[in-house]
Amino acid sequence: TPEERFIYFDKTDFGINKIKTVFPTLLEELKNEFMGKVQYVVDIVSEYEKNKGLIGNRFFNGERPEIINIKCGGDWHNDKCVLIIEAENNQKIVFKPTNKKNIEFLQEIIKMFFDEQKYIELYDSLNINEGYWCRFIEHIENKANVKEFYRNYGKILFLAYILGMNDLHYENMIAHGRFPVISDVETIFSTYISADTKRYYYDAHRKAVSLLSNGTISTGLLPVFSMVEYFGGDVSCLSNTGMKVKVQKIKNLGRDDMCIYDEYEIIKTYLHLPYNEVEPLNFVDDILKGFEEATEIWKTKKDEAKYVILKKGKSVESRIILAMSKAYSKICRMRSEVAYREDFKKYEKLIEKLKSFGDYDAIRFSCERIALINGNIPCYYWNESANPVYTYLKKNRINISISSHLKIEDIWKIILNQVSSENIIRQKQYIEDTIQTTKAMVARPEEKSIMLSNRNRTECSPEKIKSEYKKVVDNIIHQVVEGKDGTVEWIGLTVAEQDQLAYQVVDSGIYKGNSGLGILLIQYYILFKDEKVANILGELVHTYSVKERKGLYDTMETSFYNGLTGIYYFLQKYIAVYENKEAVLLKEKI
């Protein structure tokens, strides 16, 4: 039987010998992938034993509990990851192999905005050579004070905004009673540094990236509905719908024909929520209230904040995101697939594809190749005294060719601009709009069916459609980013709740690229002869022309909305309305 054959393979060397024959280098590969990680865990256990007294006094009320279990708490970088130590008497502690100065810096800032000592102590740390120990944050439900939780969330959002933090998705925050606790403090200043390292092709591009990367949207604390399909769900800390992810399962376990297969599942986690059934998107008013409170506190604490940022900010080591970690994770997982274990050159070709996602030189690519082959996610850092951007390989720090010219004094000036009255008003509008947009566009299935049935009952007379057109175009014009060089860009369209119908009546395709927007604006101009729209259309043509001259279309895909086909179709429509030499020449080149 299949079960008996499995027992035979399991109890004899037949299976192992067969694996050695089919995968002759597998054991050596596994050794290279795991030895560094195993040694890291052994070293941290040794550090725990050596510092048990200090750790016990700081975190365990003087007790010195023995280790019972160890869990990995995240991705592996350079053969290191967050470790959760489970000890006697249900006690836990966390070890993080990252810069100990970051959490100390953040704790100093948090003290200015929160009075509760118990909350401030949640960011306590104990430093050692390889990183630091910190408290294990328990998820504590609190149904009675949900509004207060989201008011505190608004204050944390303000702090993340001014400190240029990002990647604060649902896995990097824990709800602890009335308070949200940040569990990943590595991205302090990251958005500022990332924006400074980018290559800008025209002025509207520079302005759009600055508005987006230096805004509340980039923190990860707000939903971005346009990224839901890419990630399989809302990854922000305001999500409670779960993530659609591909998981590996075993079929026919305990039989000789058992195999691994992939299946999509909705994975739900509630650690970032004050309780499981809460609908975070309903608390926008409380989030805004907390954001406003933090803004007022800043006005009274600005001098104190300046001292902390200029003095302690110099020691911050900021993790810089140069590429989507999802791509790295996928390549790491694929290393375990039979096809890539059998043919290493095939895996090398897979890694080569990374070059199409960013600016790669030989050093950066070599570092990422080594990291991925050894089962690690590539990671990059910045520190004021260590420009350019760097990564780690074993004990060595490797500089790559991406640099930032920012100093802490420059970051302070950026922060002052962030808290200007104009920018605070803009950010509050972003907060409200992004949440309302997500409610409209990422509704639950039952809510969507109600929305669609309501839409079907709506009479779309010519006058109604014209009215809805005006609403849509007003929003497009309101959110346009115009450069000094006559270029134009959009950072995304947010939809107020009362304008949901307008977007449904006109065309959902306008979300799918600037060419789609251009076609919509041409149709609008034909109807209303609006000169502002005419100017934006001319700037869009000029922007496409600038991109073509800089070679950005040489390897561009040919899809309709985001590719060359869409641009060509837009230009064809535009030329039918305007006699424009730049558009005609560009159409021929496209």
Model region roles, listed by residue range:
Residues 3, 12-42, 179-468:
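C-terminal catalytic region of ATP-dependent kinase domains
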Residues 132, 152, 449, 507-523, ...:
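Well-ordered alpha-helical segments within folded domains of soluble proteins
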Residues 147, 459, 463-466, 504-511, ...:
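Alpha-solenoid helical-repeat scaffolds
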Residues 170:
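Catalytic-loop Lys-Pro-X-Asn motif of eukaryotic-like protein kinases
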Residues 436-507, 512, 520-523, 527, ...:
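Low-complexity, Ser/Thr/Pro/Gly-enriched N-terminal "stalk/linker" regions
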Residues 468-487, 532-553, 578-590:
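Long, well-ordered core segments of solenoidal/helical folds
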